Amino acid sequence: MKPFTVLDAIVAPLDRANVDTDAIIPKQFLKSIKRSGFGPNLFDEWRYLDVGQPGQDCSNRPKNPDFVLNQARYQGAQVLLARDNFGCGSSREHAPWALEDYGFRVIIAPSFADIFFNNSFKNGLLPIKLDAAELDVLFQQCEATEGYRLKVDLAAQTITRPDGKAIAFDVDPFRKECLLNGWDDIGLTLRHADKIRDFEAKRRAEHPYYFA
């Protein structure tokens, strides 16, 4: 997993509440268990005017010109502003996979669905809960300013606006450490590889019949 330290990036505003996981990545794309390749189908039913299918070349599909991610000013965005209850609906790890594969590293919203919130940290996304009034200001500034950027400093736990105002946010210390170091569940386990090998060797010596 790629470490997250400081991100200074373009922001895209998704001004919708209760964005569920089926909107983030529709059900027909869940057959694959690869973590990559979902970016072109992120928000598929909103981004395109047709119905997408797995394996389809999205480059020639008709796009919805009104959808935020299809607007030129938001190309390359790595920070997504959202509204309440982002990531609700059915549990699917494909949702953070699709957001990360598209290029997003940070999602800022007043609240998140619990399972999506937890899955995001495990897949290199930083979900930030921000007060709705503070978030309203970010939406207003973003929509009024082309090329609007935010600086997110995980170590300092701050979001810095273009006008220089720093906004503090909370993050669980363990999740923060994992993101800063790029540790997913496998990475955390491999940190103890020597102890695991020692335990296995000891167990094999003490109970050889288990391994016969």
Swiss-Prot record:
One of its GO terms (biological process) is L-leucine biosynthetic process. Keywords: Amino-acid biosynthesis, Branched-chain amino acid biosynthesis, Leucine biosynthesis, Lyase. One of its GO terms (cellular component) is 3-isopropylmalate dehydratase complex. Pfam families: Aconitase_C. SUPFAM superfamilies: LeuD/IlvD-like (SSF52016). Pathway: Amino-acid biosynthesis; L-leucine biosynthesis; L-leucine from 3-methyl-2-oxobutanoate: step 2/4. GO terms for molecular function: 3-isopropylmalate dehydratase activity. Its EC number is 4.2.1.33. Belongs to the LeuD family. LeuD type 1 subfamily. Heterodimer of LeuC and LeuD. Catalyzes the isomerization between 2-isopropylmalate and 3-isopropylmalate, via the formation of 2-isopropylmaleate. This is 3-isopropylmalate dehydratase small subunit. The lineage of its organism: Bacteria, Pseudomonadati, Pseudomonadota, Betaproteobacteria, Rhodocyclales.
